[in-house]
Regions:
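Conserved N-terminal beta1-alpha1 strand-loop-helix module at the mouth
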Residues: 7-92, 165, 252-266, 270
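A C-terminal functional module that forms or caps the active site or interfaces directly
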Residues: 188, 192-238, 242
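Short, well-ordered coil/turn segments that N-cap beta-strands
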Residues: 21-25, 58-60, 89-91, 118-120, ...
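N-terminal active-site wall of soluble small-molecule enzyme domains
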Residues: 59, 64-116, 154-155, 178, ...
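Conserved, mostly hydrophobic/aromatic
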Residues: 27, 62, 96, 122, ...
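Acidic (Asp/Glu)-rich catalytic clusters
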Residues: 18-20, 52-58, 82-88, 135-140, ...
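Conserved anion-binding
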Residues: 32-33, 101-189
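C-terminal helical cap(s) of enzyme catalytic domains, especially alpha/beta-barrels
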Residues: 223-234, 241, 245-271
């Protein structure tokens, strides 16, 4: 009888890749006409391949944002399929879909993202509770990143509301997500624009991967984000526009920007 190796969990997989390529950078793929300066659909598709070609060997993960593909209808969904295929199975691909439904609906979303498109992980909105998360936790090797304390300017309206025990809502989300991590495949999303909250989340969920958007165009604090995100567990720095549309938008400019981020991150981590 053959000997089968145990399945590696998603969180183990992302830590291993970070160590193997010495990178904690996630490259967001948010290709749009305004940023590129062209509303030609083929130009957008070509540019998405440029981003991947320029960063394939130095990106810990890629994060295509569904909205930028869905906006183009059926052709956009085909483009998304082609993008996942073009990235390939050696990289980690996170679906920035922010799904948040329950039951059978959530199950269909999970099948779409994991089985049809072939993503390794997905961003999820926890507002509807455990029913919106569990359908995505079926496979140990597929991960979820739960929105916890996001980088947008109005996030505090709900996320910094105090609960009965004086705990902030985002703190409750961090503890709750940590308690669901039975298969070692749950992570959190916390913005680089709120380093104090990021530090608090890391204390509450010391072992969960944290995906950290908001660096670059949103003006988040890179150094503090790297330090707080990686003082335990792994903190993954997501950069989209500042890499994808760097300089003259050539492969060389995109790669140079990505390399600069990897270098800055590794300097903070002393790796």
């Amino acid at each position: 009888r053959g000997i089968f190796a145990p399945m590696i969990s998603f969180n183990q997989k992302i830590k291993k890749r970070a160590k193997d390529i010495n990178s904690y950078l996630c490259v967001g793929i948010d290709v749009n006409a305004k940023s590129l300066g062209s509303d030609n659909f083929e130009d957008l598709k070509i540019h998405s391949k440029k981003i991947i070609d320029a960063t394939r060997d130095i990106a810990l993960a890629f994060k295509p944002n569904f909205a930028f593909f869905e906006r183009w209808g059926s052709e956009g969904f085909k483009w998304l399929e082609e993008t996942v295929d073009y990235i390939g199975s050696d990289s980690i691909i996170i679906a920035d879909a922010k799904r948040g439904d329950i039951g059978n609906t959530a199950g269909q979303y999970a099948e779409s993202i994991f089985d049809h498109f072939g993503f390794d992980a997905v961003t999820l909105n926890p507002y509807m509770g455990e029913d919106s998360i569990n359908p995505f936790l079926v496979h140990d090797d597929k991960g979820v990143f739960v929105l916890c304390r996001t980088s947008n300017s109005s996030a505090h309206i709900f996320q910094n509301q105090k609960l009965n025990r004086g705990q902030f809502l985002y703190e409750k989300v961090a503890e709750w997500a940590d308690s669901l991590n039975h298969k070692n495949n749950i992570g959190l999303v916390v913005g680089a624009t709120v380093p104090q909250e990021l530090s608090r989340v890391r204390d509450l969920a010391p072992n969960l991967p944290i995906l950290i958007p908001g660096v670059g165009a949103q003006g988040g604090d890179l150094e503090k984000s790297v330090y707080e995100g990686n003082k335990s567990g792994i903190g993954i720095i997501n950069v989209s526009r500042d890499i994808s549309f760097s300089g003259d938008c050539s492969v060389e400019s995109i790669r140079s920007s990505a390399q600069s981020y990897v270098k800055k991150i590794n300097e903070v981590l002393n790796v």
